[in-house]
Amino acid sequence: MSKLKLHGFNNLTKSLSFCIYDICYAKTADDRDGYIAYIDEQYNANRLTEILSETCSIIGANILNIARQDYDPQGASVTILVSEEPVDPRDVDTSEHPGPLPSAVVAHLDKSHICVHTYPESHPEAGLCTFRADIEVSTCGVISPLKALNYLIHQLESDIVTMDYRVRGFTRDINGVKHFIDHKINSIQNFMSDDMKSLYHMMDVNVYQENIFHTKMMLKDFDLKHYLFNAKPEELSAEEKEQITCLLYKEMQEIYYGRNVPEV
């Protein structure tokens, strides 16, 4: 897409939101309480603030204000307002490719906010526990928040990820013509690194005419030891391992596809 000469400021709003899920099996009620306490501490407001602040550092944004809160009995929220940076549109790379990691060069972010909310929960009987983090990066200007995607998914290792990217509003060129998107995109996947894509099953549901893009991700490899809380596979019988594996797989399938799977 050729560079546009705009009349005034770029008024397009670009929003990236995604949910990450961590799945775990905790056998007893005490273990389930222990998992929720553990994950609640791992992703408390201070830790989330560190992650989002590092995100701002990577993309070259200045933090104006931070609002954070831990909740009782569990969960946390952090919202960061970011200052507007003057950006020359000619210097902005709008091509489809993975965004930066902490060791890479930074990109500038215009008016924006970054927020995260966490939701730990557990099944009342089956031993299944899930942790969900909702993250949103929203910008107003020439930069796409997709540039922050690669870092955030690397930082928040997860079993399942669902992502939505949308562009809203319009901006005018010097001839008064409205433009409803200012960069090429056919999939969120194009903004992820190859090593990340190799780890996940992926599925797209895109509505191109509405500038809405949706991608789901689920880990390909399943290793039971990574899903047990306060237990080891060698401590379980073959029957228990098979039962727990089936429970976890069903839980992941239901979250990935967004519907309950009937018993067979």
Curated annotation (Swiss-Prot):
Pathway(s) it belongs to: Amine and polyamine biosynthesis; S-adenosylmethioninamine biosynthesis; S-adenosylmethioninamine from S-adenosyl-L-methionine: step 1/1
Domain of life of the source: Bacteria
GO annotation, cellular component aspect: cytosol
Keyword Plastid among record annotations: no
Pfam families: AdoMet_dc (PF02675)
Cofactor: binding comment: Binds 1 pyruvoyl group covalently per subunit.
This enzyme's EC code(s): 4.1.1.50
UniProt xrefs under InterPro entries: AdoMetDC_fam_prok, S-AdoMet_deCO2ase_bac, S-AdoMet_deCO2ase_core
Role of this protein: Catalyzes the decarboxylation of S-adenosylmethionine to S-adenosylmethioninamine (dcAdoMet), the propylamine donor required for the synthesis of the polyamines spermine and spermidine from the diamine putrescine.
Protein name stated in the entry: S-adenosylmethionine decarboxylase proenzyme
The organism of origin for this protein: Yersinia pseudotuberculosis serotype I (strain IP32953)
